[in-house]
Each structure stands twice: as structure tokens, then as C-alpha cells.
Amino acid sequence: MAKAELSGQRERAERLRALHRPPPILVLPNAWDVASALVFASLPGCQAIATSSAGVAVALGYPDGEAIPRDVMLEAVARIAAAVELPVTADLEAGYGPAPEDAAATADGAIAAGAVGLNLEDGSADGDGRLVEPAAHAAKIRAVREAARRRDVPLVLNARVDVYLRGVGEPQTRLEETVARATAYRTAGADCIFVPGIDDADTIAALVSAIDAPINVLATAATPPVPALERLGVARVSVGSGLFRSALAFAERSARGVLEQGSFDFAADALPYPDLARLFRRESRHQTTGKE
């Protein structure tokens, strides 16, 4: 990696890290391709871009859950990172393999692709609903941290705890289990703790109070609005595959209107073609001149 390119990547990593010190809360749209990343990056309130593992996979014809080959996922991340000047953090699921070496190789590839942050989840990649042992996931985190050190990029590592999302254990035990896992992951080198599957303010507040790390929540229709999350002390909120699924739902409704009612009403809400062209002219200039 060229010296100027490495310097720029370090700067973006530090910028992303600084955004995890609320207030204000960091609101992350999750892109699934270059077009969605360019749209999000063009908005005044967008300070960084996340990728959606589900969105990237499904858009390329794969189911979610590490069915997409690692090199294909990283190529998508590279295209997104090259298209925008904002920091990009990549959702890389469980790290593409059970061993710390697997997670380290994935992190190394993500940094080479231009990412400056990544998600690493403790849910089992085989889809059986289990979580990996905390010590095993902590070992992956340490391996990712070391891979970033070797690359000399201060990667922002967002460790995902899937206790609530996967409904692990009895409801009354989930808070304690989440805090225990989060503490282990933080000690291993995680910068932020991501707890999807929580929507009620009391649980969110309890996690913010008990975990000595910035907290990331996943937005759903039931999640408190951004100002309320900020008051609760949440550092980061991401939308996961939500915007991707919303785009698919809009496409489905639009096509249904055309095919079943012969209506073209959808066109009134479409992105104007000149705006689309402007996005890609800007992206083309960016690719030509480079980030620095």
C-alpha cells in the first residue's frame, strides 16, 4: 500500500473512532453496493458508511450467513470503499471461519479493501442459533486486533453480541450474559459493542450503564428514535439490512402496480435520472483522482 494511501486510511480510521464518542450519536446507513453507498454519502448527515452483509450477499445472489465467498464479499467492500471518501466499516459476520486465523485473514482482507472498521459477531455461522464460547470469540478479536496492528491501521472493531437477537437462554438471564460477553470482548480489544435484538429503553439503558464501551444498537420499526437513543447514551445506531429490504419492498410494490394495475405512479418517487448521473460522475472523478 502506498504511503499516501495508508496515511489516508489511517485518517479515516481515526475519524471513525472519534465518531464513537457521543454526543452526538453516530447514525450509520448500511450500503449494499456502490450505488446505495453513493446515495447515502451524498446526504448532509452521513458521516460514515457501513455495509450490510445480508444486503451485499442477497444483491449478488447468495443467502445471508457467510454463504457468499469471502473474496466476493471483500470485492464488494473494496468497490464501496473506493467509491466514497467517508470511512467505511464492513459487516463481515463471524469472520469466515471458526479459528482466530480465519478472522485475522478476513480482517487483513478488509483493510486491504479499504475498510477502516468491521463487525464480528459471536453467533455461530452454521445457522443453528448457537453462540460461540466467549473465550473463542475473544481469541478472534485479539487476532483481528493483531492483523490491524500489522497493517498499521487503527481499525474500529465492533463486536456483536447475539444473545438477544437469537433468544439465547431465559429472558431474565440475557442481560447478565450480554454484559459478561461484552466485557470479555472489550478486554480482548473490541472498540464498540453491538447488541442487536433490543428495542425497549430500559434494556438499552441498562446495557449502556453496565458495559464500559460505546454501544451500537440495530434500528427496527420498534426502536426508539435517534434523539431518544442519544439521551440513553447509545453511541451508534445502524440500520442493518433495513434500507436494502425497504428498497426491495418499494421495487416490489412498484412492479406490482405496473403489472397488476398498469400504473406508473412509482415514477413520481424515483430518483431523477440527472441526480443518478451526477452521483456517478462524482464517483468517476473520485476514482480518477484518488482519495488523497
Language-model regions, residue ranges each:
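Alpha/beta enzyme core
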Residues: 2-239, 246-253
